[in-house]
Design a protein with these regions (language model features):
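A contiguous, surface-oriented mixed alpha/beta subdomain in the mid-to-C-terminal portion of proteins
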Residues: 190, 199-268
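Polybasic, proline/glycine-rich intrinsically disordered low-complexity segments
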Residues: 230, 239-359
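Charge-rich, low-complexity segments
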Residues: 2-193, 308-367, 371-376
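Short, flexible coil/linker segments at or flanking structured domains
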Residues: 159-161, 177-179, 222-226, 262, ...
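Generic alpha-helix detector with strongest preference for long hydrophobic helices that associate
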Residues: 17, 52, 183, 187, ...
Length: 376
């Protein structure tokens, strides 16, 4: 069963902004509205449907969590939950070994603070990201300065294994050879991964492209192929100093032949199989610490449960847009936060080959230049 959230907007034309109280009302992304056409909730709030997946719960709070999980799996990862056996383990050692072999760099550079203490094993204790690590005397520590205040403690750089398979459950994670992402707004690039055969080649190609440019980044890829295919099978994180590497990621990924499939509903299409999103910024209770896809799924789930409390099957487009705005989400482009800057490919010039015209900017807010140029 499919019912429209709002009247369909003709293809190629952005929805018009209604005026409310003298100010333009927030406009809900056309792509998100279409993705939510197959989502509804029973007026009693105990049953909801996301395409072919049915969700049941005994309370509004339980429905918010259950519906958010299904929205995440169906609309973000592209997998769905219907008739799917749960994954028994998040890790597959043989597959992780293939990913480790495909990783082009063995080490990363990490910054830490030398505490001046020794561990029980006699190792120097270095504090890295709030964790205390025992470092043998044979390891080289390069002092770069001292901490502020008091006597100050040495700030050091040290080489560590690039792979950190236990940091993000379900993913094999590495930091770049030149270091990982630092502070500032964090950009996520999602790459659709087809299967176990495609994953190592994609992983190697993208990371090699970044390493050849000495980009600081963090990347992760599904560590158990049973969870494939999925839209976010591989994720690359770029800080402000690395945003100009977006093209390198896209070109390397597309060269491997990414699989076709509907893009994640909440992310911004960059190219076929590649989408982007900013790290969520929502300090409300229950919304902090969520991944991008989880956060957007919870925003939508809350809006649908609120509609059921009014004995309706779905929220209006205006209510969904208001729910996005309350969560610091740009309703017109839900991959952005309301306080996000422009997409990097709008601010970092893309050099065109000599003699080739520079392509015009896209007409719609939902699609990046790369996506427009690659769409028939």
């Amino acid at each position: 069963m499919s019912t429209h959230v709002e009247e369909t907007v003709p293809r190629g034309r952005a929805p018009e902004r209604a005026v409310v109280g003298g100010a333009p009302a927030p406009v809900l992304s056309t792509g998100l509205r279409r993705a939510l056409e197959d989502v509804r909730i029973a007026p009693d709030g105990r049953t909801a449907w996301v395409r072919d997946d049915e969700v049941t719960a005994e309370s509004a709070s339980a429905m918010r969590f259950a519906l958010a999980r299904t929205l995440y799996e169906v609309l973000h990862t592209g997998r769905g939950v219907k008739d799917r056996a749960p994954v028994r383990t998040l890790r597959a050692p043989d597959f992780e070994a293939r990913l480790a072999k495909a990783t082009p760099h063995p080490e990363t550079v990490a910054e830490g603070v030398l505490t001046g203490r020794r561990s029980a094993a006699g190792r120097r204790v270095v504090e890295i990201d709030g964790l205390r690590v025992g470092v043998p005397d044979t390891a080289t520590l390069r002092e770069t300065g001292r901490t502020a205040g008091g006597p100050g403690r040495p700030v050091v750089l040290m080489n560590l294994p690039s792979a950190r398979p236990l940091v993000s459950p379900g993913f094999f994670l590495v930091d770049g050879g030149a270091g990982r992402t630092g502070g500032g707004d964090l950009l996520r690039l999602y790459l659709r991964v087809a299967d176990a055969d495609a994953a190592p080649g994609l992983w190697h190609a993208v990371l090699s492209g970044l390493e050849s440019r000495s980009v600081t980044y963090r990347a992760k890829i599904i560590s158990n192929p049973v969870s494939l295919p999925r839209n976010d099978g591989m994720v690359v994180y770029l800080g402000p100093g690395s945003w100009d590497a977006v093209d390198a990621v896209v070109e390397s990924a597309l060269a491997t032949g990414l699989p076709e499939g509907p893009p994640p509903a909440f992310a911004h299409v960059v190219a076929p199989g590649v989408t982007a999103a900013w790290e969520p910024k929502d300090g409300r209770t229950g919304m902090r610490g969520l991944s991008f896809g989880e956060h957007r799924a919870h925003v939508v789930a809350r809006a649908f449960v609120a509609a059921a409390e009014r004995h309706r099957e779905r929220p209006t487009a205006a209510e969904l847009a208001a729910a996005c705005a309350a969560a610091n989400v740009d309703p017109a482009d839900p991959a952005r936060n309301l306080d996000s800057g422009d997409w990097p490919w709008h601010t970092v010039p893309r050099p065109a080959p000599a003699g080739d015209p520079v392509p015009p900017a896209p007409a719609a807010a939902d699609v990046s230049p790369a996506a427009r140029d690659s769409t028939p």
